[in-house]
């Protein structure tokens, strides 16, 4: 059975672990536990063929900047996550996350993933952002960044309501299996 390695990166507390737990168990975790490094595996059927989707969670906190790239070798696709209600996490996509993964894995495809979309219409979240003269990130703004950074595409979801959640992983699988170049040369290799 072919394995697809999918590594999830992004700032701390944008919902990377919730995304993975909600997708793999259909349950939303009730408390925040910062991640050091976790992985999950699910079997998915694509075109009648079974694949193992290996999902690798990473810690977004700066303390792990030197440790995190150890999970990058052999990655088939990255999910670069930001919260649609955290402008700083969106900014870090281009300032930190895409430079980091493209430095280590220049040929590996990545998707830009907006998380926590259920909070985009939440009055108290909107009010908090407004106090700092900020507002939620719109899909159009994120799609433009995805194009500018040469992401495969922009997708968004809510791990809480599961809206768009399955689509994130379906698109990740498609990106990993897309054959623009021979498969072997697209996997991440640390030299």
From Swiss-Prot:
It is an enzyme of class 3 (hydrolase). GTP binds at residues 10-17, 57-61, 115-118. Keywords: Cell membrane, Cell projection, Cytoplasm, Cytoskeleton, Differentiation, GTP-binding, Hydrolase, Lipoprotein, Membrane, Methylation, Neurogenesis, Nucleotide-binding, Phosphoprotein, Prenylation. One of its GO terms (biological process) is phagocytosis, engulfment. One of its GO terms (molecular function) is G protein activity. Its EC number is 3.6.5.2. Phosphorylated by SRC in an EGF-dependent manner, this stimulates the binding of the Rho-GDP dissociation inhibitor RhoGDI. GO terms for cellular component: centrosome; cytoplasm; lamellipodium membrane; membrane; midbody; mitotic spindle; spindle midzone. Regulated by guanine nucleotide exchange factors (GEFs) which promote the exchange of bound GDP for free GTP, GTPase activating proteins (GAPs) which increase the GTP hydrolysis activity, and GDP dissociation inhibitors which inhibit the dissociation of the nucleotide from the GTPase. Interacts with CDC42EP1, CDC42EP2, CDC42EP3, CDC42EP4, CDC42EP5, CDC42SE1, CDC42SE2, PARD6A, PARD6B and PARD6G (in a GTP-dependent manner). Interacts with activated CSPG4 and with BAIAP2. Interacts with DOCK11/Zizimin2; the interaction activates CDC42 by exchanging GDP for GTP. Interacts with DOCK9; the interaction activates CDC42 by exchanging GDP for GTP. Interacts with DOCK8 (via DHR-2 domain); the interaction activates CDC42 by exchanging GDP for GTP. Interacts with IQGAP1. Interacts with NET1 and ARHGAP33/TCGAP. Part of a complex with PARD3, PARD6A or PARD6B and PRKCI or PRKCZ. PANTHER family: RHO FAMILY GTPASE. This is Cell division control protein 42 homolog. It comes from Macaca fascicularis (Crab-eating macaque).
